[in-house]
Amino acid sequence: MLKIFNSYTRLQEQLEVDKKKTINMYVCGITAYDFCHIGHGRTFIFFDVVVRYLRSLGYALKYVRNITDIDDKIIAASLKNNESYISLSNRMISNMKDDFSALNILPPDSEPRVTENISDIIKFISILLNKKHAYVACNGDIMFSVSSYLNYGALSNQFSKILNKEINISHYSTKKNIADFALWKTSKSSIFVGWNSPWGNGRPGWHIECSSMCRSAFKNKIDIHGGGVDLLFPHHENELAQSVCIDSNFSIKHWMHTGLVIINNEKMSKSLNNTLLLRDLLTQYDSEIIRFFLLSTHYRHPLYFCYKNLSNSSKLLKKLYLSLRGVDFDIKGLDIVDNFKTDFYKAMNSDFNTPLALSILLRLSKEINKFKLIDSNKASQLASKLRQLGSILGILLKDPEYFLQNNFNCNNSIIGKINSLIYERDKARRVKDWVRADRIRKELLELGIVLEDTSFNTFWRSLQ
């Protein structure tokens, strides 16, 4: 049975679903003010694997991933770029979709935008006001009253005296409590983006946006709510508080959070100017290499980025593709592959242990290489299973020859020379000119190319 670490209880818990095997999953998406970076890649590739795995188990999954298309950062960036917030957010959403498509991240079943949910947001704020969980600040903003929700802080475990400390209103004129946060921000100037509401022209606060979109998609039942660990507090803490205060029957069974990305021993952040954009990384590495690298660390652990580790992921993925070379991997697998499948699913059932799952794929590839020499039918059965299990992780989806040749670091003229030499060597072998055939093999070896002869073809691979 699948067990998931729940950020709320801090325990691994069994995923329990209804008789129809339906699962509702909501993941906080991007704020569309800049290009996506490797932190986005880590989070959304991981939840893409969750989607693929749950569906492979036969669950009827509904996956919703929102887009924040109005926000302080979006407004600031649009003013800096001298473009409308709509133009900026649409441009960044388009770039996100290009990046995610390149990384083979499956699109969600629904991708709601904040600006499409303003009426629902206003309705939910009104409910919070009527229930005395919110108040109108002296500047006209609508604030959530943290002290009205006794369980505040339980999700993130970030308790502090300051959360319940009444403060001097002259210092924080919009708040009764320093932890209170905005549900609705009233327009303060002509450049302020806003919508009409019972409280005047304004726009929603960040946290109420997700509460609204969650409830619109799933009502009161969410099985999995995910996002990066940087969202745990205050965003997810505040989101949960609002949602429960709107309706006490609201529940989220499992909270899941991906770990931080560390670059040069520092947390990756825009303030430190050390972000690595996905689009830049995709110009240097195949998308499957990036996926392999990001899945090589357990999703809850910090991921330490360095190019050496990316290169190592490239070598390991090439090993998997090399084992698929020269076999019929579309053949149906039989009993001999059951042990690998069992081990793979056991790893994934243990809180999505993708590093262990990848190691099982590498073990399977060694078995394929062994049977290539003694039993081609068994090799094909194993290769079929490798391809199938790899697809759950979003890898091994390409033609092996295409992948291996396109990830060999040289230009087309050198690849052409390699293929030409292999052709000349094949001609020499057909007329039993072994001296010439061996000379060409040595010439290719000097280029860093190793040949692999099979009964029906000759393949090459790089020593890089």
UniProtKB/Swiss-Prot annotation:
It is found in: Cytoplasm. Its main location: cytoplasm. A motif ('HIGH' region) lies at residues 30-40. A motif ('KMSKS' region) lies at residues 267-271. Monomer. It catalyses: tRNA(Cys) + L-cysteine + ATP = L-cysteinyl-tRNA(Cys) + AMP + diphosphate. Gene3D superfamilies: Cysteine-tRNA ligase, C-terminal anti-codon recognition domain, HUPs. Binds 1 zinc ion per subunit. It is an enzyme of class 6 (ligase). GO terms for cellular component: cytosol. Belongs to the class-I aminoacyl-tRNA synthetase family. Zn(2+) binds at C28, C210, H235, E239. ATP binds at K270. GO terms for molecular function: ATP binding; cysteine-tRNA ligase activity; zinc ion binding. Keywords: Aminoacyl-tRNA synthetase, ATP-binding, Cytoplasm, Ligase, Metal-binding, Nucleotide-binding, Protein biosynthesis, Zinc. The keyword Lipid metabolism does not apply. Transmembrane segments: none annotated. One of its GO terms (biological process) is cysteinyl-tRNA aminoacylation. Its EC number is 6.1.1.16. It comes from the Bacteria. Its cofactor is Zn(2+). SMART domains: DALR_2. NCBIfam families: cysS. This is Cysteine--tRNA ligase. CDD domains: Anticodon_Ia_Cys, CysRS_core.
